[in-house]
């Protein structure tokens, strides 16, 4: 089971999340049938959305949009505070790796553009923040968002490692570390050093207690408190009824055309690839 551990330093100067999102990203890859570069980019965006969702409470929904001008096209992920996330990438069929190392290349195919974060708290107007993509690697871009839009110095790491023989998802996860208002410059320097010198996310996620290992490495000698473990999962809230309401909102003429030309309708959810079919009778009931 995927999960996130939330923590805070005992002096209250830092907080950190550590996530294992392997099953989440694996399910996204299987549902969307993405190729390696697209899998890694979508996976990183899903993990980023899970990090942002874990920051929230109640019924708040977070939408993360990576809007670059590269061949990848838009990457969209939607998460809630309960650990659920869904998402898609426009171009699923990108497969580029460094010839020397086999490393999957992401940034060149994301390109230049924007990271947009939309918070929907159920109020009249959702909150929206936007920053330039500074690397296109997504983790660094999310850290830049926290600093620019929320004035919170942060370090974010997100990683998706694929199996070399099959390009399926081997491991996926990440972390977020934030300096809180009372953090001193010396403490921030110490934490930065810890993060720069710790093993890769993929390496830590293969350890016996992966998320504890990640937090131990982030905090180093600083004592911290575990605030709890929470489950994570790929979960879409689409339904046949919800899409039927969408069809109804189109109005009489488009529905009559569906009946006359196709004798029904088929809708595939963009976020999860679930397919919904509507009979001629179901469509007629919408306009009678």
From Swiss-Prot:
Cellular component GO terms, alphabetical: cytoplasm
A single BP term in Gene Ontology: protein refolding
UniProt keywords, alphabetically: Chaperone, Cytoplasm, Disulfide bond, Redox-active center, Stress response, Zinc
Protein name per its UniProtKB record: 33 kDa chaperonin
Disulfide bridge positions per record: 236-238, 269-272
Highest taxon of the lineage: Bacteria
InterPro entries named in the record: Heat_shock_Hsp33 (IPR000397), Heat_shock_Hsp33_C (IPR016154), Heat_shock_Hsp33_N (IPR016153)
GO molecular function, one term: unfolded protein binding
């Amino acid at each position: 089971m995927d999960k996130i551990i939330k923590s805070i330093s005992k002096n209250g100067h830092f907080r950190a999340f550590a996530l294992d999102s392997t099953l989440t990203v694996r399910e996204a890859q299987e549902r969307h049938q993405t190729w390696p570069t697209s899998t890694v980019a979508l996976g990183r965006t899903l993990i980023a959305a899970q990090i942002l969702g874990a920051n929230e409470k109640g019924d708040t929904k977070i939408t993360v949009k990576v809007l670059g001008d590269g061949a990848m096209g838009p990457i969209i992920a939607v998460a809630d505070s309960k650990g659920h996330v869904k998402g898609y990438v426009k171009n699923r069929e990108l497969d580029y790796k460094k010839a020397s190392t086999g490393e999957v290349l992401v940034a060149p195919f994301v390109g230049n553009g924007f990271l947009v974060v939309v918070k929907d708290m159920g109020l009249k107007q959702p909150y929206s923040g936007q920053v330039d993509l500074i690397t296109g690697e997504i983790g660094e871009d999310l850290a830049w968002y926290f600093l620019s839009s929320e004035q919170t110095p942060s370090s974010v790491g997100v990683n998706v490692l694929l199996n070399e023989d099959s390009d399926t998802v081997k491991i996926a996860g990440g972390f977020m570390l934030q300096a809180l208002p009372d953090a001193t410059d010396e403490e921030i320097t110490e934490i930065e050093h810890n993060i720069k010198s710790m093993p890769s996310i993929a390496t830590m996620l293969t350890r016996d207690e992966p998320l504890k290992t990640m937090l131990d490495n982030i905090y180093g000698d600083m004592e911290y408190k575990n605030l709890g473990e929470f489950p994570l999962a790929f979960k879409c809230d689409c339904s046949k009824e919800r899409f039927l309401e969408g069809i109804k909102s189109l109005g009489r003429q488009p529905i009559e055309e569906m009946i006359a030309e196709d004798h029904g309708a088929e809708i595939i959810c963009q976020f999860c690839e679930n397919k919904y079919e509507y009979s001629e009778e179901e469509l007629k009931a919408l306009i009678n």
